[in-house]
Amino acid sequence: MSHIPISNTIPPKQTDGNGKANISPDKLDPKVSIDMEAPEFKDFAKTMVDFIAEYLENIRDRRVLPEVKPGYLKPLIPDAAPEKPEKWQDVMQDIERVIMPGVTHWHSPKFHAYFPTANSYPAIVADMLSGAIACIGFTWIASPACTELEVVMMDWLGKMLELPAEFLVCSGGKGGGVIQGTASESTLVALLGAKAKKLKEVKELHPEWDEHTILGKLVGYCSDQAHSSVERAGLLGGVKLRSVQSENHRMRGAALEKAIEQDLAEGLIPFYAVVTLGTTNSCAFDYLDECGPVGNKHNLWIHVDAAYAGSAFICPEYRHLMKGIESADSFNFNPHKWMLVNFDCSAMWLKDPSWVVNAFNVDPLYLKHDMQGSAPDYRHWQIPLGRRFRALKLWFVLRLYGVENLQAHIRRHCNFAKQFGDLCVADSRFELAAEINMGLVCFRLKGSNERNEALLKRINGRGHIHLVPAKIKDVYFLRMAICSRFTQSEDMEYSWKEVSAAADEMEQEQ
């Protein structure tokens, strides 16, 4: 075997002409700062705040969809990081030159794709403070305020929605809330908790069965209109998920029960069902008051996914859509979609968090602390270990808007959707593809799917507004979502004119 020679000699220092070590002073002198100093930070931050305010207040004037092609950005910046620090003024100049040409402006009143992602000045300021505190709140002791504010904010939010007391810490029971990153995470966390719960129950009934056998029999359920993240949760959780055929885009209790009984007859073990309140395709609402009791009867974990529509439940007139919530084991919605709280902030409540906590509990010595058990360690409630101080955003928004103004925001968006729907049905060329729910209008040109595909391509190609499509039972349609907090009635008229003009162009070319 060959050996690599090892030298025990210390390489000679580089010296100047006088024999002194030639080392630059800034690498030795602890008094020399390599950081941006506070006065410079203040100037930089003030300039950025001015830029943000100018950007948002005038966002309507920007083309909503960028015209760049993949790879546009690389030629605009150097191939490697700079050796020496640059001036922050140069960075500011590059925002318009490098970044803005490739930004899709989600907060423009002309952006109608997907569902909204929330944005507000109080939330932006809260994120500044969160970034400054820069704690990683995986345990209570890692930053007590981070954990304790989250506990209180989740109770505030739960009370605003009038969730059953069993979900709230203030009830004194087992329940509680946690801020996840996304609804997708919440769905997966609930599935893994349900999986652990059912595994324990079946092992007690059949101690002779091994874990692999039990896991192979587990089956969960969701509507055929459920979000793709539900299917993905099944893949990540290693369990079968069965799609239940919907009726008018909504899952009924009878259909769920039929699917459960079929699987029981085949020797499978039903354990979990997702009930969607506000589907992505058409904002349809599964019958929670039917599906929940069916799940309870068969001892399934019922998870309610209200990612978009859940914000509307702060308005009393929409709470009938969550009828049956008392039958749920977990409930989730995204304040970062429609409640003016910047991404990411996904609110999740569990009636009995212990199933999730025990399923995720890995407790190394370096994460233990003397107060364990006296307050939640949220690392046990989620997939990642680390977590940001997201409760600050909720606290700022709820205090600086108040419930009344948040309700007004929701109602305005719902009214704008009705306005657009009225404009649509007044044109004999168009039809609604689904009932108008919340801030979403599903519409189409009468005729073939191909005509509607061509219409959407033309609308987005014009670049003045941005929409995305959906398809239900082989019917292709366009989705008009009200997304921006800056939206006014005039914006809905403008967006309709864009749709109508695109249809006119198609007719003229025929």
From Swiss-Prot:
This one is known as Aromatic-L-amino-acid decarboxylase
Q: Could you confirm whether the keyword Lyase appears in this record? A: yes
**What are the N6-(pyridoxal phosphate)lysine sites (modified residues) in this protein?**
337
Cite the EC number. 4.1.1.28
Q: Which CDD domains match?
A: DOPA_deC_like
Q: Which gene encodes it?
A: Ddc
Q: Output the PANTHER family linked to this UniProt entry.
A: AROMATIC-L-AMINO-ACID DECARBOXYLASE (PTHR11999:SF167), GROUP II PYRIDOXAL-5-PHOSPHATE DECARBOXYLASE (PTHR11999)
What does the subunit comment say?
Homodimer.
Organism in which the protein naturally occurs: Drosophila simulans (Fruit fly)
Q: Identify which cofactors the protein needs according to its UniProt entry.
A: pyridoxal 5'-phosphate
Function, as annotated, reads: Catalyzes the formation of serotonin more efficiently than dopamine. Displays no activity to tyrosine. Variation in the synthesis of bioamines may be a factor contributing to natural variation in life span.
Keywords for this entry? Catecholamine biosynthesis, Decarboxylase, Lyase, Pyridoxal phosphate
Q: Where does pyridoxal 5'-phosphate bind?
A: 183-184, 227, 305, 334
Spans traversing the lipid bilayer = none
